[in-house]
Design a protein with these regions (language model features):
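Hydrophobic, well-ordered secondary-structure segments
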Residues: 101, 122-125, 138, 156, ...
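Short glycine-/acidic-enriched loop or helix-start segments at secondary-structure transitions
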Residues: 16-17, 72, 127-129, 150
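Gly/Ser/Thr-rich loops at beta-strand to alpha-helix junctions
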Residues: 10-13, 64-68, 118-126, 145-147
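Short, acidic/small-residue loops that bind anionic groups at enzyme active sites
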Residues: 115, 119, 128, 132-156
Length: 179
C-alpha cells in the first residue's frame, strides 16, 4: 500500500491577480470566493490523473478541509475517487496559515507516508521544508505566483506522472533540489 500525503495551500496563486508577490500576508477582505478554487483545481488535475492510472493500492493522508481541497462545494479527493485518511485539521477551517502547513506536513510524516505532495508556491515549499527537511521525498504541484524552486513538477499532470512512476517502480531515483 502506497501512502501519499497531501498539503494544499488554498490561497496559493491569489497573490498575482492581487498585484502581490505571493499569498503570504494576504488581505482576505480582497479575496473573492471564485478565486479560492485555483489550488483546488490544480490538486484535482493531479489527483484525477493519478486515479485514472488504475493504481488501487493507494491511500491519501492529509489535514481535513481546505488543506486537502475539501469544502462543502468541492471535495477534490472524493471527485478523484481516492481514499483519504485525515491526520488532523487546521486551527481555523476557513483560514489556513504557515503554521497549519507545517503542522500538517509533520502529522503526515508521522503517518508514515511514502511521498508528500504539496500544492502551492515557493512559500509553501519553504514551509514544507521547514517542517520535514529531507526526512521524506516531497514533490510540489505548481499553483503559486512565484515558482522558482526545483521541487516543483512543471504541471499538475506531470506531478501525477511522477507519482505514478514512483508507485509502479519506474522511477528509481529521488534527488534533492533547492527550495
Amino acid at each position: 500500500m502506497f501512502k501519499l500525503g497531501i498539503v494544499v495551500n488554498p490561497f496559493a496563486g491569489l497573490g498575482g491577480p492581487m498585484a502581490m508577490k505571493g499569498s503570504d500576508g494576504l488581505d482576505l477582505s480582497r479575496v473573492h470566493a471564485d478565486d479560492l478554487g485555483r489550488s483546488a483545481a490544480r490538486a484535482l488535475r493531479c489527483l484525477e490523473r493519478i486515479a485514472e492510472s488504475g493504481i488501487e493500492e493507494l491511500t491519501v493522508y492529509g489535514f481535513a478541509g481546505l488543506m486537502s481541497a475539501q469544502s462543502a462545494a468541492n471535495d477534490v479527493l472524493r471527485i478523484a475517487g481516492l481514499p483519504f485518511i485525515s491526520v488532523g485539521q487546521p486551527a481555523d477551517p476557513n483560514l489556513t496559515t504557515q503554521v497549519d502547513t507545517r503542522e500538517a506536513a509533520q502529522a503526515i510524516v508521522k503517518a508514515g507516508v511514502d511521498l508528500l505532495l504539496f500544492v502551492g508556491g515557493d512559500g509553501t515549499a519553504r514551509d514544507i521544508f521547514t517542517a520535514v527537511g529531507t526526512r521524506i521525498p516531497c514533490l510540489g504541484v505548481p499553483a503559486g505566483v512565484k515558482m522558482h524552486s526545483g521541487v516543483y513538477a512543471v504541471s499538475p499532470e506531470s506531478a501525477a506522472d511522477i507519482v505514478v512512476a514512483l508507485i509502479t517502480g519506474k522511477l528509481v531515483e529521488v534527488t534533492q533540489q533547492e527550495v
